[in-house]
């Protein structure tokens, strides 16, 4: 059981939840024992980390993705940052999730929705929206046209966004969002 938990936690940058622990067959009393012996560290309510797990640059993202569960994905400005698209310098960690518990911290910006498998990719311990989904999310959000232009131009330049795929997507977008995407595409050609 310990090996199964270690495998699961390592896939999540060392993080795991109370729910995961109990599903693997640990007793509630085991949690206290592992905290007392120092092998587990309590991070937040119902969120723990293996003490000896190596640190990562993706740790803050992994922590919150683990806390919200398998349906959570890094999105919007945070996804753009991780993809290297634009210079948005987000003040919050943006997550898309179907869960609706209140945010446990003010450092999160939650976007409540479900994402299809074609809209996310696995990057190390994280689920993250694809560059295309990220650009579309940003076009629908409140970022400036100049910043959106930069995100789209960077994505096209490094081959992570297809201008033709974004153009095709415009037909199914609300009018104002489609116009913003079209302007961004025009700015990068």
Describe the residue ranges of each PLM region.
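Short gly/ser-rich loop at a beta-strand->alpha-helix junction or flexible surface loop bordering the NTP-binding
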Residues: 1-189
